[in-house]
Structure formats: C-alpha cells, structure tokens
C-alpha cells in the first residue's frame, strides 16, 4: 500500500447532526476528549457556563449559546485521523449545515432520549438521504428520564425511514441507569456516574448470564432479560452493507454529559464508517488515492479571527496530497494559484499546515475570489457536483434608505449571497429586490454587514412570498408559454437562474398540477 493509500485509509470524516439542545455540543467535547484533544472536557459548554465551547467561537454564538458556523476539528484516535465537522444546530443556519453534509463520508445523529426525533433532525436526515450518507445514531441523556427505547427505535424507523439496529441496549435510566448491554458481544458496560470531565477506564461485565451481572442489575435483572428477548426478536440485526448504503443505522445509548457511551460510537466510526470515498465531477469520478490533488469549497466564513479581518474558505480534499507552497488550479477562474498558508483546524486554534490528504478539511485565505462550490485541482478542468442551494423559507423586500446607493446595495447583497446563507431575487415585473433566508437571524446579519462593509443602510418590508422554486424545462415552447402565464411571479436569482416565487402553498400546488412539463426544484447546485 502506498503512503498515500495508507493515509486515506486512516481518515474518517463525519459530521454531527441533531436538533438544538439534544446534546451536540457536549458530545463534540467528549469526542475531542477521546482523542485527548481537550485535556479537561468542559470547555465546550453552552449558554449557562462561563467556560465556552472551543467549537462555538463567534461572538454571536458565545452570546446565544448556539453553534452558528460549522467548525472543523481534527484529532487522532486509535491510529486513525478523525475529522469532525460540527454543524450549526440553530434552525436559522440549516443551509450551512446542509452544505457541510456534502463534505463528509458519514454522520452521527444525536437524539434526545426524552424527546426522540425532532423537526431539525428530520430535515437533516433528508439531506443525508440525498447522498445515501451512512448514519450512526446516539440516543443521549440516559442519565435523565427517557422514553421507552423500543418506542424510540420505532420512531426512528417510521419518521426517518431508515432501519434501526441497536448495538447497545440501556439497562434502566435516570437514577436507575446501570449501563448498557452490548448485544453482539454479550457484555455489560457499567455506568459510573459523575465522570463527565475525565476519561475513566471502562468497567465491563462479561456475559449477561453471570453472577456478576445478576448482582449489578439486582431487581432489574429478570425484567431486563425479558425485554432483551423482545428486542432481539423485534429489531434488525446490524448489517454493515445496509449501513454503508444509508439504509440502516446502528444505534447506541448513553449520556454525553456523563461521558458514557461516546467511546463506543467513536469505535463504531473507526471500525465501520467508510474511509474517504470517490467523488463525482461533471466529467468523471475522482478516486481519493489518485496522485493529483483536488478538492472543493463547501463553506466560506468571514471574520474568523477578530485579530485578522479575514475570510476563510473551507475545502474538503478529494484526492492527492496538499503540500505547503504547492500550485493548484482554481477551475472556475482558470487560474493557477500558489497556496503557501493553508490552515488546519483545532477549533479556534488555527495552525499552518504542512501536508493533508483526501478526507481532510483545510482552510484557504480568501480575498473575495473563492465561492462556495468552487473546485481546485492540479491542472485538470473538472467541477465537483452536488453542493446544494436550498429554497429559502422566509422572504423580505429590501428598501434602501438612500436611493442613490442602489448599485452598492446590489453589489453587497450579491456578494453576501455568495457566502450562501441568504439568496437574492430580482423580480421580472419591477425593480424590487427580494432577500430570501432560512431564518430570521440572517436578515439581521445581512443588514448589519451591509452597513459595516458596504456603507449601505437598508430596511425590510413584508412581502407576499411563501416559497421559491427554481424552474427547469426541456421544452423551449412550453417554457415560453409558462413564462408568459406566470410572469407576475417570476424572478431571477443572484446567479441568473429563473425562479418562481409562490405566494402560497396552494398556488404552488396548482402551478405544479397545471404545468406537468415544468420542474419546480426546491434545490439547485452551485456551479
């Protein structure tokens, strides 16, 4: 095996997805602790604590206790190199999260055992399904009252439409939580409370049918054995092929706060989750072990460092090897650039990078020339596919306070839209400018950045738009007919794509019925 193939085989690149407050920040911290990346866990605490999350670094995040922007953290574990992408849990930032999911090879879904499947989890799972991303599930908060575990598995299957195969099974919960039973290995991993901030040696009882197990479970023993028979009869057995196809999720139980069960999840990612995979481009498929370098940008983050006012483009390496000072082609611009100062991330610790391989995430300094979806290669002209734009869910008309600044306003809105958190639309029938976003928070962010960076003051007005759909049609004649009829509701987005702005859900359903030849797309790719 070449050095490069060996390096690729070591890589595991995954994201954590969850509904806000399911415990994602805590589990991130515990994973870093497993990799000994944080000496004392407890630095990644949200909201109420004064020790702030190493992965929640932006000022607005610190104030609100939510991860707004995706952080990337790399750490070693069991002779592998783990790239962990933390995704925003706050609902306003789902686009950022969606695109992060294009940069990973697997995902860890964290569910609150007391609440089960929640809305944001459903939305994120839909995105994982678009790419058949393998999903590992962790049911968290076993140190509190949780719902019936069998009910939770049924809900995962019914709502998320994926087979659930329990790998571990909880013994009691809340004050009676005794640990978990590993179904395939026939052993009990004992829960020792109160060790959230340190790694402790795991205590294991081999075989459920043993005196030691009976003594540990006490009164719970007989009921647990019965429950287990039911579980083994009713639940799926784990099938690695089905997992790799995105059809089945292995399920683990534990408590991230109590630092219990997280190591089993990380072991599962190392043992079962895929190493970096081949990636599709418009021209061909690119293998991670190819000698020549390639990668794509899935995120741009402004002002990551208050000390240096900068923008960083996050790039997923898809093939070859990055070496300091190498030349690479910025395919969209057709230009060769020398990259001497790419960054690797240990959350807010940014370090200059000497080399990196497929699966790794590196940061490039961006002076306004790099856009989301851009491909970099070592000379070859191809573009990676599948980096999505999603239809916004909220719309506002933008009103300029100084009419003489309309040029700056257009430029500002288009440049901010390039970062991918908002989208701008220009209606065909008038000179309005409409801003679309996935959450209210983004409108505030845009207004303050327009004022700061472009010296433009704007206000927002309500507008009668329910949703946007990108229009595609193979039949020119039908498309022209549609454009004439739907003229009132048509606009062009910042990238020049024809878009239908539907005033209501009913209106959109009617249009889809009336125009079967027109495709109303809720997503489109970055080109």
UniProtKB/Swiss-Prot annotation:
GO terms for biological process: regulation of translational termination; translational termination. Its main location: cytoplasm. It is found in: Cytoplasm. Residues 9-277 form the tr-type G domain. GO terms for molecular function: GTP binding; GTPase activity; guanosine tetraphosphate binding; translation release factor activity, codon nonspecific; translation release factor activity, codon specific. GTP binds at residues 18-25, 86-90, 140-143. The keyword Transferase does not apply. Keywords: Cytoplasm, GTP-binding, Nucleotide-binding, Protein biosynthesis. One of its GO terms (cellular component) is cytosol. InterPro entries: EF-G-like_DII, EFG_III/V, G_TR_CS, P-loop_NTPase, PrfC, RF3_C, RF3_dom_3_sf, RF3_GTP-bd. Increases the formation of ribosomal termination complexes and stimulates activities of RF-1 and RF-2. It binds guanine nucleotides and has strong preference for UGA stop codons. It may interact directly with the ribosome. The stimulation of RF-1 and RF-2 is significantly reduced by GTP and GDP, but not by GMP. PANTHER family: PEPTIDE CHAIN RELEASE FACTOR RF3. Belongs to the TRAFAC class translation factor GTPase superfamily. Classic translation factor GTPase family. PrfC subfamily. This is Peptide chain release factor 3. It comes from Pseudomonas aeruginosa (strain ATCC 15692 / DSM 22644 / CIP 104116 / JCM 14847 / LMG 12228 / 1C / PRS 101 / PAO1). The gene is prfC.
């Amino acid at each position: 095996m070449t050095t490069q193939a060996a390096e690729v085989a070591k890589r595991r690149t995954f994201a954590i997805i969850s509904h806000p407050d399911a415990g994602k920040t805590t589990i991130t911290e515990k994973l870093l602790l497993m990799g000994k990346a944080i000496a004392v866990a407890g630095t990644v605490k949200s909201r109420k604590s004064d020790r702030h999350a190493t992965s929640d670094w932006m000022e607005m995040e610190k104030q609100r206790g939510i991860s707004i922007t995706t952080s990337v953290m790399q750490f070693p574990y069991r002779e592998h190199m783990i790239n962990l992408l933390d995704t925003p849990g706050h609902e306003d930032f789902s686009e950022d999260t969606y695109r992060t999911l294009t940069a990973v090879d697997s995902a860890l879904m964290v569910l609150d055992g007391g609440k089960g499947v929640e809305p944001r989890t459903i939305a994120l799972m839909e995105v994982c399904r678009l790419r058949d991303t393998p999903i590992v599930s962790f049911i968290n908060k076993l140190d509190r009252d949780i719902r019936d575990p069998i009910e939770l598995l049924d809900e995962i299957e019914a709502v998320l439409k994926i087979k659930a195969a329990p790998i571990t099974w909880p013994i009691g919960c809340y004050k009676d939580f005794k640990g978990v039973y590993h179904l395939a290995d026939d052993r009990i991993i004992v829960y020792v409370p109160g060790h959230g901030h340190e790694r402790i040696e795991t205590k294991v009882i081999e075989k459920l049918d043993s005196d030691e197990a009976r003594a540990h479970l006490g009164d719970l023993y007989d009921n647990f054995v019965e429950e287990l028979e039911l579980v083994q009869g009713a639940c799926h057995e784990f099938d690695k092929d089905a997992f790799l196809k995105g059809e089945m999720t292995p399920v683990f139980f534990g408590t991230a706060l109590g630092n219990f069960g997280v190591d089993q999840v990380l072991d599962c990612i190392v043992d079962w989750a895929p190493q970096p995979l081949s990636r599709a481009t418009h021209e061909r498929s690119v293998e991670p072990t190819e000698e020549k370098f390639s990668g794509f940008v899935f995120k741009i983050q402004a002002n990551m460092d208050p000390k240096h006012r900068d923008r960083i483009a996050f790039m997923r390496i898809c093939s070859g090897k990055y070496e300091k000072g190498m030349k690479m082609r910025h395919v969209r611009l057709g230009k060769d650039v020398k990259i001497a100062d790419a960054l690797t991330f240990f959350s807010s610790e940014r370090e200059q990078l000497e080399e990196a391989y497929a699966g790794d995430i590196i940061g490039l300094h961006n002076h306004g020339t790099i856009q989301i979806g851009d491909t970099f290669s070592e000379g070859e002209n191809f573009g990676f596919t599948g980096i999505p734009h999603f239809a916004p869910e909220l719309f506002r008309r933008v009103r300029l306070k100084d009419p003489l600044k309309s040029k700056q306003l257009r430029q500002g809105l288009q440049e901010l839209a390039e970062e991918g958190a908002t989208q701008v639309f220009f209606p065909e029938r008038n000179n309005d400018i409409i801003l679309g976003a996935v959450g209210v928070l983004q409108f505030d962010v845009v207004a303050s950045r327009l004022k700061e960076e472009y010296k433009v003051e704007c206000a927002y007005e309500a507008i009668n738009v329910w949703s946007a759909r990108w229009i595609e049609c193979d039949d020119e004649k039908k498309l022209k007919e549609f454009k004439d009829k739907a003229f009132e509701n048509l606009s062009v987005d910042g990238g020049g794509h024809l878009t239908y702005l539907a005033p209501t859900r009913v209106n959109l359903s009617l249009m889809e019925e009336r125009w079967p030849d027109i495709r109303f797309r809720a997503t489109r790719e970055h080109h």
